[in-house]
């Protein structure tokens, strides 16, 4: 049975178990060893879903609780996934969550944790000893939504990043890291990036460009990543260009402000949004509001500021009314919106 644990990144105290589907409230107190008066004794409410691999976080206190630097908002709820960092208050007291196989007694649980720690140490040693050279992979021709790469070569740079991700491929929110290594999903790869088909495409054409380097989210990006994100953009443009014609909707390249999956990825998506996987308002607004950060704009942001600025409260954009991205007419529901889109992009 999978168990969820809240782990202090400061290492100030032992991990806190979050039972499946049970409410746990933490804040200032002996359990967390937080003495900061700006932190309420009931600062956050946590509820783990061990089946889906995330924790629902609700801010109860007055001062801000945040995930990866983005404030949640009082009485608001946000999903915390493995690989992301929860700061209890005022960007202080960082925590992460881990999902582990449950044990039958506390002694066995400690052994599980020790084995996990030992495994991480061994993987770190492996990473340090891995080389950094890599051969450039030739892109397979005739990329299409249903096509896949027919070749899979091993190369040391790719293996280095693979080793870093092995321990986290078991949870759904880490699914991109597993798909990156799946030859049937790959349509292109080189020494810096891999392109895969989106497993649940939200349009006729929908790919993801991912760096081999492990980068959790946009907040981590800095000036030293500029060359990498420019390369990701160039690769995305190349793939889009191969499918651009008079009958095809234009493409958009960009990133979700707060991605649902861990590991930075660039969306290359056609603007027809003709897909059965596009099911709800959240899906739609994640691509048609400012929640979707255009790739070129993000590159300019890194050039100018040396980082990516994600606006506070950006998640609220996912709740805005459904509106056609072409004519800006508001639609009552998803079926009506999908029918309306056919006027712009006939099948």
From Swiss-Prot:
**Keyword line:** DNA damage, DNA repair, DNA-binding, Hydrolase, Metal-binding, Nucleus, Zinc, Zinc-finger
Q: Which CDD domains match?
A: aprataxin_related, FHA_APTX
Q: Where is the composition biased (Low complexity)?
A: 142-156
Motif Histidine triad motif at which residues? 263-267
Residue numbers annotated as active site:
265
Which SUPFAM superfamilies does the record associate with it?
HIT-like, SMAD/FHA domain
* Transmembrane intervals: none
What does the record give as the reaction this protein catalyses? a 5'-end adenosine-5'-diphospho-5'-2'-deoxyribonucleoside-DNA + H2O = a 5'-end 5'-phospho-2'-deoxyribonucleoside-DNA + AMP + 2 H(+); a 5'-end adenosine-5'-diphospho-5'-ribonucleoside-2'-deoxyribonucleotide-DNA + H2O = a 5'-end 5'-phospho-ribonucleoside-2'-deoxyribonucleotide-DNA + AMP + 2 H(+); a 3'-end 2'-deoxyribonucleotide-3'-diphospho-5'-guanosine-DNA + H2O = a 3'-end 2'-deoxyribonucleotide 3'-phosphate-DNA + GMP + 2 H(+)
- A GO CC term assigned to this protein in UniProt: nucleoplasm
What Gene Ontology terms for biological process does this UniProt record contain?
Answer: DNA repair
Q: Name one GO molecular function term.
A: zinc ion binding
List where Polar residues composition bias occurs. Answer: 123-133
Residue spans, zinc finger C2H2-type: 322-344
- Renumbered to this chain, region (Disordered) spans 107-176
For the keyword Cell membrane, the answer is: no
Q: What EC number(s) would the UniProt record show?
A: 3.6.1.71, 3.6.1.72
Q: Which InterPro entries match?
A: FHA_2, FHA_APTX, Histidine_triad_CS, HIT-like, HIT-like_sf, SMAD_FHA_dom_sf, Znf-C2HE
- Give every FHA-like domain span: 23-72
Q: What is its main location?
A: nucleus
Q: Where in the cell is it found?
A: Nucleus, Nucleoplasm; Nucleus, Nucleolus
Q: Which residues form the HIT domain?
A: 173-278
Looking at the UniProt record, the site noted as Interaction with DNA substrate sits at 179, 256, 267, 282
Q: What class of enzyme is it?
A: hydrolase
Let me see what the UniProt entry remarks about domains: The histidine triad, also called HIT motif, forms part of the binding loop for the alpha-phosphate of purine mononucleotide.
Q: What does this protein do?
A: DNA-binding protein involved in single-strand DNA break repair, double-strand DNA break repair and base excision repair. Resolves abortive DNA ligation intermediates formed either at base excision sites, or when DNA ligases attempt to repair non-ligatable breaks induced by reactive oxygen species. Catalyzes the release of adenylate groups covalently linked to 5'-phosphate termini, resulting in the production of 5'-phosphate termini that can be efficiently rejoined.
Name the UniProt record assigns to this protein: Aprataxin
Taxonomic lineage is: Eukaryota, Metazoa, Chordata, Craniata, Vertebrata
Q: Which gene encodes it?
A: aptx
């Amino acid at each position: 049975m999978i168990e969820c644990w809240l782990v202090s990144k400061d290492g100030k105290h032992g991990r806190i178990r979050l039972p499946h589907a049970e409410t746990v409230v933490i804040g200032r107190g002996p359990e967390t060893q937080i003495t900061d008066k700006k932190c309420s004794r009931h600062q956050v409410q946590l509820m783990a879903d061990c089946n889906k691999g995330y924790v629902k976080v609700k801010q109860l206190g007055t001062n801000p609780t945040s995930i990866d630097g983005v404030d949640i908002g009082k009485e608001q709820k946000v999903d915390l996934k493995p690989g992301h960092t929860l700061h209890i208050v005022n960007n202080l007291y960082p925590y992460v969550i881990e999902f582990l196989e449950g044990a039958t007694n506390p002694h066995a649980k400690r052994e599980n944790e020790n084995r996990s720690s030992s495994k991480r140490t061994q993987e770190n040693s492996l990473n340090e000893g891995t080389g950094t050279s890599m051969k450039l992979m030739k892109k397979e021709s005739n990329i299409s939504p249903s096509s896949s790469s027919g070749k899979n070569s091993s190369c040391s740079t790719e293996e280095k990043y693979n080793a870093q991700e092995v321990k986290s491929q078991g949870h759904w929110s880490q699914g991109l890291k597993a798909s990156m290594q799946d030859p049937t999903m790959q349509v292109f790869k080189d020494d810096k990036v891999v392109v895969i088909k989106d497993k649940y495409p939200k349009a006729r054409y929908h790919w993801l460009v991912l760096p081999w380097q492990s980068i959790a989210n946009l907040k981590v990006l800095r000036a030293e990543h500029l060359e990498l994100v420019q390369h990701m953009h160039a690769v995305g443009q190349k793939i889009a260009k191969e499918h651009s014609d008079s009958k095809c909707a234009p493409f958009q390249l960009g990133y979700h402000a707060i991605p649902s999956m861990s590991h930075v990825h660039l969306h290359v998506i056609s603007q027809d949004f003709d897909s059965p996987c596009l099911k709800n308002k959240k899906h739609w607004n994640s691509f048609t509001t400012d929640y979707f950060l255009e790739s070129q704009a993000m590159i300019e942001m890194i050039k100018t500021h040396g980082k990516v600025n994600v606006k506070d409260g950006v998640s609220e954009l996912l709740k805005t009314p459904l509106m056609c991205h072409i004519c800006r007419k508001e639609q009552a529901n998803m079926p009506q919106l999908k029918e309306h889109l056919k006027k712009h992009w006939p099948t």
